[in-house]
Amino acid sequence: MNEDTWLAVDEYFEEQLIGEDPALESALAASAAAGLPSIQVSVCQGKLLYLLALASGAQRILEIGTLGGYSTIWLARALPADGQLVTLELESHHAAVARQNFKRAGLAERIEVHVGPALETLGRLREQRVAPFDLVFIDADKPNIPRYVKSAVELSKPGSLIVVDNVVRGGAIVAPEPDASATGVRQLASWLAGQTQLSATAIQTVGSKGYDGFLLARVQS
């Protein structure tokens, strides 16, 4: 097995199970034209996020790391008509591209974009005592990932689902000398190991985005 096979399998399932999607394809094209890095979730992973949000009956979703809004669109589509998605993005240029993508997808009214350091925004959301989120998707800088998850728990409720992307990092998570990103994920795993408030697991993935994985945690109490 090699990366060519992983890519071919992804393409097969995209064609068989998902098909073409003008709004999502437009979002990817606009993001590329604006110079955004191509680090968004894959098509199949986006559909997975959509199904997780749909299956959980999420009415409020929090996303940390907007980029061009590709995963945001997948998640927002799973919301009911009166649902809301709050997404946090550090870079104003990325946020501007994402907002245009949301308009083209017909989802702008469901999505609230906050620009600036995520930890600061999360602090403000806690201070404002916003309604709890049913699902949280975290796809942001990994050195801060333990703090993001702890904030997510504070903004959630029993039954909420927290999904963290890029936790395997090509196997760097078990490297003898992990880099800062892998170290952040390891710190998160160590913290989760001592928690009774959350039940968590991690899944390795291969595909068009290489070798990586997701961590999923359910807020128990």
Regions found by a protein language model. Name each.
Residues 4, 39, 43-221:
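S-adenosylmethionine/decaboxylated-SAM
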Residues 18-33, 39:
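S-adenosyl-L-methionine
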Residues 8, 12, 34-36, 102:
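Residue-level signal for pocket-adjacent positions within structured domains
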Residues 1-21:
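N-terminal auxiliary segments of SAM/dcSAM-dependent transferases
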